[in-house]
Amino acid sequence: MAGDLKPPAPRPTHLAEAVRFAWPYLARYRRGFALGMAALLMKDLLAAALPVVIRLGVDSLGAGFQLATLLGFAGLLVALSAVKGLFQYAMRLVLIGISRDVEFDMRNDLFARLVTLSGSFIARYRTGDIMARATNDLNAVRMMIGPGVMYFAETSITLVLAVAVMLTVDWRLTLIALTPAPLVSLAVIFFGGRIHDRFERIQAQFSDISSRVQETLSGMRVLRAYLQEQPELAHFEALNRDYVARNIALAKLSAVFYPVLQALIGLSFLLVLWAGGTRLLEGRISLGTFVMFNTYMGMLIW
């Protein structure tokens, strides 16, 4: 039973470690995952095409208003948006569904492993640590595999496609729009590590609370025999106050991070309005191009 005495594996501290841990489970659904990513790619391609259609429509109307032309571009936009919505639905259905399946498999494997462990393992290591891994930790893994991977891929592909189109139309205006990008990267690096650390502290505190609840329930008769209900209640309240404080600390940091990020991205929008408006008045770009750039900036902000 020597193998039973190994402590619970430490939580992954980096995204790469978390991906390596989850990959054997994710590989079971690689075909579905590939299908979901294909739907994501198609959705992003259609989304990137919409501003181009808007640009063509605005420029064509600038040459002379024709109802048939307006209706044609409007119908094309509606059709592209509808197909994009279908791909987006398929993307979420498949990728989020796979994350639920992976979570289900992990829970089953964890439980199957736990029932084979010896009593010495249970005696040596806190039950709360195991409970935390079976609840909060697995939920976090599911969020990383599902929404985490999906939103990361979606944002990355949208950024590449939008910048590629913008560069082909007006590379100077694109460079101006991307001026705040290094500041955005620095903000993500600065806040990202701190948010991760505070999230880890929350997970650790949840483990402490789970252990305390299990120990209290197991020793309830002893607590009552020695009249320790009030001290135990006070200790449990202290643990919960600490848990709340750690969550508030994370919320405060997030409350600073997201406005800073939005402000930096909004600066890009402002630069496009200023530089693009100037180039429009000087006749260097068309009205459709100006509208297209602003549409792409709106996509990147959201």
Where are these regions (language model features)?
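Alpha-helical segments in transporter systems
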Residues: R20-W23, R31-V52, L56, F73, ...
